[in-house]
Amino acid sequence: MTIVYLSLGTNMGDRAAYLQKALEALADLPQTRLLAQSSIYETTAWGKTGQADFLNMACQLDTQLTAADFLKETQAIEQSLGRVRHEKWGSRTIDIDILLFGEEVYDTKELKVPHPYMTERAFVLIPLLELQSDLKLPPNHKFLRDYLAALDQSDITLFSAQQTEF
């Protein structure tokens, strides 16, 4: 089994409902168990301004799937929830990013793990560290909380403090 950490985000429609539907779909993945979810945070858009605010959260799973198969499953969930990939950093019904896949490192066209921008995004690190405060970034094993300490967190507000274990 491999412990996987995901970031989920949405800024279209009923944002909280999209997060819930994504969590339900993740919990139903084959050979995978949803272990925990973070609180939900509201943040301004990153990368492209002038769009609606995002709701962001993280979750922790345990899977027997390969990283490539897990990516295919998360992309299928995104598509089933209406995700259309037409613009980089554009609005979306749901975005599911693989942040960490065990201690593994991937650098392919399809998959980059650890996620290449995670250390630059407080809206990713805050919910992620809520799940596991002593996470380290492979392969250098620097604490993720050290990256967070260097980031501006002023535009991130708690939306829902629900933290559920499965």
Curated annotation (Swiss-Prot):
UniProt-listed SUPFAM superfamilies: 6-hydroxymethyl-7,8-dihydropterin pyrophosphokinase, HPPK
| Top-level class of the enzyme under EC nomenclature | transferase
Give the Enzyme Commission number.
2.7.6.3
Which reaction is this enzyme known to catalyze? 6-hydroxymethyl-7,8-dihydropterin + ATP = (7,8-dihydropterin-6-yl)methyl diphosphate + AMP + H(+)
For this UniProt record, the keywords arranged alphabetically read as follows: ATP-binding, Folate biosynthesis, Kinase, Nucleotide-binding, Transferase
**Which molecular-function annotations from GO does this UniProt entry contain?**
2-amino-4-hydroxy-6-hydroxymethyldihydropteridine diphosphokinase activity; ATP binding; kinase activity
- Copy the pathway line from the protein's UniProt record: Cofactor biosynthesis; tetrahydrofolate biosynthesis; 2-amino-4-hydroxy-6-hydroxymethyl-7,8-dihydropteridine diphosphate from 7,8-dihydroneopterin triphosphate: step 4/4
For this protein, the record's Gene3D superfamilies field holds: 7,8-Dihydro-6-hydroxymethylpterin-pyrophosphokinase HPPK
State the coiled-coil residue ranges: none
Pfam families, alphabetized: HPPK
Q: Name one GO biological process term.
A: tetrahydrofolate biosynthetic process
Write out the function statement from the record.
Catalyzes the transfer of pyrophosphate from adenosine triphosphate (ATP) to 6-hydroxymethyl-7,8-dihydropterin, an enzymatic step in folate biosynthesis pathway.
**Family membership noted in the UniProt record:** Belongs to the HPPK family.
Protein name per UniProt: 2-amino-4-hydroxy-6-hydroxymethyldihydropteridine pyrophosphokinase
Q: Which organism is it from?
A: Streptococcus pyogenes serotype M6 (strain ATCC BAA-946 / MGAS10394)
Lineage of the species this protein comes from:
Bacteria, Bacillati, Bacillota, Bacilli, Lactobacillales
UniProt gene name: folK
